[in-house]
UniProtKB/Swiss-Prot annotation:
The lineage of its organism: Bacteria, Bacillati, Bacillota, Bacilli, Bacillales. This is Polyribonucleotide nucleotidyltransferase. It catalyses: RNA(n+1) + phosphate = RNA(n) + a ribonucleoside 5'-diphosphate. Transmembrane segments: none annotated. Its EC number is 2.7.7.8. It comes from Bacillus subtilis (strain 168). One of its GO terms (cellular component) is cytosol. GO terms for molecular function: 3'-5'-RNA exonuclease activity; magnesium ion binding; polyribonucleotide nucleotidyltransferase activity; RNA binding.
Length: 705
C-alpha cells in the first residue's frame, strides 16, 4: 500500500459515506478515516509481531470519545478526557462482538483496534462509522482477519423499516436495533423495542442484513484497491500425538464428570480428572510447554464432549431437556427500609434488585457526545466475586457490568411510566448473589419485581431469558435458559427480554461466523415460550404493582404557575427558593413551562412549600379583600403583608372612618387587619384601604337594620 491518499465514497441511508486511506496514521498496520455526513472517525488496527504465550486471543477494541468532536471543553479541574463514558464502553463492546469471531482459532498475536471520534454529526452515528472503520482497518491491514463485517441501525416508523434513523426519527421509532454481520450471516444483534412481536424483530434483523451486504461489497472494493497482503502468522497448534495420549487417559472419566448435575460437584469432578492427568505428565518430567498443552487438550476435551452430548444425544450437563427452564422462585419486600426490593432465583443464578425513587432533580446528568443531557431511569448491575464462590478485588464496574446494566435498562425502559404520570427518578440496582449463567436476565426479572414492590405503575411486567446454541456442521440444537458451562462452551448467547405482548430488548453474541434466519427464528420462538413461563412464575409472587408507594419514598406534589412568575419563586441568586427549601425541608424542581415538583418524605412539608409558592405567585387583584399583617409603621401609614412576599401601603387617611392623628393609635406591628386593594400603580406598588372595608361593613349593617 503506497503513501498516497485514496478516497472512496458511497451513499449510506441518504448520507455520504467517505473512506480515506494512505494519509493518516501510516505506521499502524491498517488505518482509515471514515467520514459519514459531518461525523469523522479515525480507525486503526495494530498487531504484535510475535504471538503471546496465552491460551486465549488477546484482542482489545477501544472506542475513544473526544469532546472537541462536539465543540466542548471537558469539565473539572484537569480539563481533559478522563475514564471512558458509559456510552464509549458500550460502543467498544458493540464493535468487539462482531469482530472477535472472525479471527482464526489458535491466533495468539495481540491485536488492538482503536477508533477515535473526531467530529460528531448527531444524525450520522459515530458508533456505526466506528464499526465500519474498525472492520475496514483490519481488512486493509496485513493482519489475518476473516472479515469484513459491517453494522447498521434499524428503526421502524408506521410499519416501515429505516436504516440509520436520525435522532428525531429514533424518538418516533418503536425499534432501535443494531445488527452486524458478514455478507453471509448475522453475527451480532443489540436492540431495544417497545413490546414488538418476535416476527417483526426478525424482519428488522433481516432488513438490516441486506444493507450490510452492500456495505461489505464496498469494503471489498477498497481492500482490492489498497489492501496489504496478509501476513503469514503461525497459529497455536496442539501436538497430535500428545492429543491422542491425553484423550486415551481422560476421555472416559471426563464424560462421567461432565454429567454430574450440580454445578460445583461437576466442577470438582472435572478438576479431579484434569489434575490426575496433569500430575501424571508432571511425574514424567515433561517441560512447561508440554504441561501447558496438556491442560489445553483437557479443556478442549470437556468442550467437545459437552457439545457432542447436546447435539447428538440432546443431553445437557445438568440433565434438563433442551427447552427446559431451571427451577424458579421469587420474593418481594425483603429490605424494609428500601422503597422496593425483589429477589429472583433461577437454578443456581440469583439476583436481588432494589428500587429507589427520587425527585426529578436526582436525574443523572450526562456530559458526552450525545444530544441527551439527563436520564430519569437508571439500572445498575453489580457482580461480586462471591457470586461464583471465589475471592477477588472489589473494583468499580468493568465493561461487563456496564454492558449488563445497560441491557437491563434497555429492557425495562419501555414500561417505565412517563414523567407526567409518575414524576419520579427511578434507580434500580441489581446485586448478583449467585451466578451460573444468565445473570443479566435474572437482574431484569428481579428489577421488575422491585419496581412492582415499590409501587411504580409499570405498563407491563418484563422477564428475560438467555438462549444458547450448539452447532456441528448442518446440525444444531437451540437451548433454553443456558447455564454457565453452556454459555462458555456453546456457540451463542442470545438474550431476549420482553412482556407478554412483545420484545423490549435483544442481545446476541456468537462465537461462530454467523447465524441463518431459520436458527434466529427458532431461538426467538423458543425464547417467547420460556419468557411466558418465567412471567407466570413472577406474577404468582406479585400480580401487579402495589397501589401505595413505600412510606419511606418521597411524596411528590405537582403544581403549575405562570412561567413569567418562575423568577419570583427562585429569587435573586436563588435566595427565595433556598429559603423555602430551608424552611420546609423539601426538594423543588421547576420546569420551563411553569410546572413545579415539590418532594419530601413529609407531606406537611410539601403542603407548606406549596402554600408559600402560591403566595409568591399570587396576582394581587384590585377590589379584592385580604387579611394581612402589619409589618412596618411610618408616619404616613402602615405597610401590610397581604400574603407571603407581597406588601401594600395603607395610607394614614385610609386606616379608619374617622380622622387619624397617629398611625399607632389604630394599629401596631403584628396586628392582623382586613384590607381592600384600591389601586396598583404603574410601578407595581399596591395601595390598600382599611377605611373602605369598614365603610362596606357599616353600609351592610344599615341595610340589614
Amino acid at each position: 500500500m503506497g503513501q498516497e491518499k485514496h478516497v472512496f465514497t458511497i451513499d449510506w441511508a441518504g448520507r455520504t459515506l467517505t473512506v480515506e486511506t494512505g494519509q493518516l496514521a501510516k505506521q499502524a498496520n491498517g488505518a482509515v478515516m471514515i467520514r459519514y455526513g459531518d461525523t469523522a472517525v479515525l480507525s486503526t488496527a495494530t498487531a504484535s509481531k510475535e504471538p503471546k504465550p496465552l491460551d486465549f486471543f488477546p484482542l482489545t477494541v477501544n472506542y475513544e470519545e473526544r469532546l472537541y468532536a462536539v465543540g466542548k471543553i471537558p469539565g473539572g479541574f484537569i480539563k481533559r478526557e478522563g475514564r471512558p463514558s458509559e456510552k464509549a464502553v458500550l460502543a467498544s463492546r458493540l464493535i468487539d462482538r462482531p469482530i472477535r469471531p472472525l479471527f482464526a482459532d489458535g491466533f495468539r498475536n495481540e491485536v488492538q483496534v482503536i477508533s477515535i471520534v473526531m467530529s460528531v454529526d448527531q444524525n450520522c452515528s459515530s458508533e456505526m462509522a466506528a464499526m465500519f472503520g474498525s472492520s475496514l482497518a483490519l481488512s486493509v491491514s496485513d493482519i489475518p482477519f476473516e472479515g469484513p463485517i459491517a453494522g447498521v441501525t434499524v428503526g421502524r416508523i408506521d410499519d416501515q423499516f429505516i436504516i440509520n434513523p436520525t435522532v428525531d426519527q429514533l424518538e418516533k421509532s418503536d425499534i432501535n436495533l443494531v445488527v452486524a454481520g458478514t455478507k453471509d450471516a448475522i453475527n451480532m444483534v443489540e436492540a431495544g423495542a417497545d413490546e414488538v412481536p418476535e416476527e417483526i424483530m426478525l424482519e428488522a434483523i433481516m432488513f438490516g442484513h441486506e444493507e450490510i451486504k452492500r456495505l461489505i461489497a464496498f469494503q471489498e472494493e477498497i481492500v482490492a484497491a489498497v489492501g496489504k497482503e496478509k501476513s503469514e502468522i503461525k497459529l497455536f497448534e496442539i501436538d497430535e500425538e500428545l492429543n491422542e495420549k491425553v484423550k486415551a487417559l481422560a476421555e472416559e472419566d471426563l464424560l462421567k464428570a461432565i454429567q454430574v448435575h450440580e454445578k460445583h460437584a461437576r466442577e470438582d469432578a472435572i478438576n479431579e480428572v484434569k489434575n490426575a492427568v496433569v500430575a501424571k505428565f508432571e511425574d514424567e518430567e515433561h517441560d512447561e510447554d508440554t504441561i501447558k498443552q496438556v491442560k489445553q487438550i483437557l479443556s478442549k476435551l470437556v468442550k467437545n464432549e459437552v457439545r457432542r452430548l447436546i447435539t447428538e444425544e440432546k443431553v445437557r450437563p445438568d440433565g434438563r431437556g433442551v427447552d427446559q427452564i431451571r427451577p424458579l422462585s421469587s420474593e418481594v419486600g425483603l429490605l424494609p427500609r428500601t422503597h422496593g426490593s425483589g429477589l429472583f432465583t433461577r437454578g443456581q443464578t440469583q439476583a436481588l434488585s432494589v428500587c429507589t425513587l427520587g425527585a426529578l432533580g436526582d436525574v443523572q446528568i450526562l456530559d458526552g457526545l450525545g444530544v441527551e443531557e439527563s436520564k430519569r431511569f437508571m439500572h445498575h448491575y453489580n457482580f461480586p466475586q462471591f457470586s461464583v464462590g471465589e475471592t477477588g478485588p472489589m473494583r468499580g464496574p468493568g465493561r461487563r457490568e456496564i454492558g449488563h446494566g445497560a441491557l437491563g435498562e434497555r429492557a425495562l425502559e419501555p414500561v417505565i411510566p412517563s414523567e407526567k404520570d409518575f414524576p419520579y427518578t427511578v434507580r434500580l440496582v441489581s446485586e448478583v448473589l449467585e451466578s451460573n449463567g444468565s445473570t443479566s436476565q435474572a437482574s431484569i426479572c428481579a428489577s421488575t419485581l422491585a419496581m412492582m414492590d415499590a409501587g411504580v405503575p409499570i405498563k407491563a411486567p418484563v422477564a428475560g431469558i438467555a438462549m444458547g446454541l450448539v452447532k456441528s456442521g448442518e446440525h444444531y440444537t437451540v437451548l433454553t435458559d443456558i447455564q454457565g458451562m453452556e454459555d462458555a462452551l456453546g456457540d451463542m448467547d442470545f438474550k431476549v427480554a420482553g412482556t407478554e405482548k412483545g420484545v423490549t430488548a435483544l442481545q446476541m453474541d456468537i462465537k461462530i461466523e454467523g447465524l441463518s434466519r431459520e436458527i434466529l427464528e427458532e431461538a426467538l420462538q423458543q425464547a417467547k415460550k420460556g419468557r411466558m413461563e418465567i412471567l407466570n412464575s413472577m406474577l404468582a409472587t406479585l400480580s401487579e404493582s402495589r397501589k401505595e408507594l413505600s412510606r419511606y419514598a418521597p411524596k411528590i406534589l405537582t403544581m403549575t404557575i405562570n412561567p413569567d412568575k418562575i423568577r419570583d419563586v427562585i429569587g435573586p441568586s436563588g435566595k427565595q427558593i433556598n429559603k423555602i427549601i430551608e424552611e420546609t425541608g423539601v426538594k423543588i424542581d421547576i420546569e420551563q413551562d411553569g410546572t413545579i415538583f415539590i418532594s419530601s418524605t413529609d407531606e406537611s412539608g410539601n403542603q407548606k412549600a406549596k402554600k408559600i409558592i402560591e403566595d409568591l405567585v399570587r396576582e394581587v387583584e384590585v377590589g379584592q379583600l385580604y387579611l394581612g399583617k402589619v409589618k412596618r409603621i411610618e408616619k404616613f401609614g402602615a405597610f401590610v403583608e397581604i400574603f407571603s412576599g407581597k406588601d401594600g401601603l395603607v395610607h394614614i387617611s385610609e386606616l379608619a372612618l374617622e380622622r387619624v392623628g397617629k398611625v399607632e393609635d389604630v394599629v401596631k406591628i403584628g396586628d392582623e387587619i382586613l384590607v381592600k386593594v384600591t389601586e396598583i400603580d404603574k410601578q407595581g406598588r399596591v395601595n390598600l384601604s382599611r377605611k373602605a372595608v369598614l365603610r362596606e361593613e357599616k353600609e351592610k349593617e344599615e341595610q340589614q337594620s
